[in-house]
Design a protein with these regions (language model features):
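Adenine-nucleotide phosphate-binding core of ATP-dependent small-molecule kinases
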Residues: 173-207, 252
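Glycine-rich phosphate-binding loops at beta-strand->alpha-helix junctions
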Residues: 210-235, 248-252
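Short glycine-rich, Thr/Ser-proximal phosphate-binding strand/loop in the N-terminal lobe
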Residues: 4-43, 121-124, 128-129
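Short beta-strand-loop/turn "lid" adjacent to the catalytic site in phosphate-handling enzymes
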Residues: 32-38, 55-87, 113, 122
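Short glycine-aspartate micro-motif
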Residues: 2-8, 63-67, 100-104
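Glycine-rich phosphate-binding loop plus the immediately following alpha-helix
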Residues: 37, 120-161, 261
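Glycine-rich phosphate-binding/hydrolytic loop that grips phosphoryl groups
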Residues: 138-139, 246-266
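Phosphate/pyrophosphate-binding loops at sites that engage ATP/ADP/AMP, CoA/4′-phosphopantetheine
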Residues: 49-64, 202-214
């Protein structure tokens, strides 16, 4: 039996998980997802880890492996570090065993990964554009529109005449949105337009790694945005790809899960 922790330090949040692994049967003990905001991500990771230990009734000495991913390589108490594409692929297959591709949609970039049935990476590609296709950009727009982040997806699905944001540059795209607001364009139509722009680029990213059929699991901070997921599948159909994108309630934890599993089987 192995007890292993996975810590994914991202740009916007720290995701921490704790597993007990016996054979090939993992038991999820505890999890936390903490927004970084203005805090030190490494101190936050340590607080989260200690909180999970307390929740699970464990001591630090009970944990066999502390695996990090994302920006966690400099975390003082980690045992080993794993690259994000490998952890997201492994975590995705745990969450959905049929997943043969992953879309990691994070605060600063998007990443498409093609993987096998074990969660081993076959190829991957990241967005090269600046942040108009990122979670941070969408968060900034939501703040400007005066809406909560968790309202973005549902508002997007209410659009009746979306206004597409064409600019790749985040600064220019934000200027486009300001102009839309001054023209009286509704929040649902603005958000749907942003989703259309993001989804088009993400679908092309999937195609570029050869993900042309099967299940795609969305991971990362934007994975639970149902408006983006709906628009992504619309874009996939338009590009005549035989894949379907899904999410999972625990999609944001995929990187931390994968790190924990790679640590357990070292």
């Amino acid at each position: 039996m192995t007890i292993t922790a996975g810590i994914d330090i991202g740009t916007g949040a720290v995701k921490t998980v704790l597993f007990r692994v016996e054979g090939d049967k993992p038991e999820w003990l505890a999890k936390r997802n903490d927004r970084i905001r203005q805090r030190d991500p490494f101190k936050l990771a340590e607080e989260a880890y200690n909180g999970l230990l307390e929740e699970a009734g464990l001591k630090a000495s009970d944990v066999d492996y502390v695996a990090t991913t994302g920006e966690g390589e400099s975390l003082a108490f980690h045992t080993g570090h794993f690259y994000s594409m490998t952890t997201h692929a492994r975590g995705a297959v745990y969450l959905n065993p049929e997943a043969r591709a992953v879309l990691d949609i994070g605060a600063l970039h998007g990443r498409a990964i093609r993987n096998d049935e074990r969660g081993k990476v076959e190829t991957y590609k990241m967005t090269s554009q600046c942040a108009s296709g990122s979670g941070q950009f969408l968060e900034n727009i939501a703040r400007y529109l005066g809406i909560a982040q968790d309202e973005i997806g549902s508002l997007s699905t209410q659009a009746d005449n979306p206004e597409v944001v064409s600019s790749i540059c985040a600064v220019l795209a934000e200027t486009d949105v300001i102009n839309m607001v001054s023209r009286g364009i509704s929040a649902p139509n603005i958000l749907k337009g942003i989703h259309i722009s993001m989804a088009g680029r993400l679908a092309k990213l999937l195609k570029s790694v050869g993900a042309r059929e099967g299940v795609v699991l969305c991971t990362g901070g934007l994975a639970l945005d149902e408006g983006l997921l709906k628009t992504l599948n619309e874009s996939i159909q338009e590009q005549k790809m035989a894949v379907v994108a899904y999410n999972h309630p625990d999609s944001p934890y995929a990187g931390a899960i994968g790190a924990a599993f790679w640590g357990a089987f070292r």
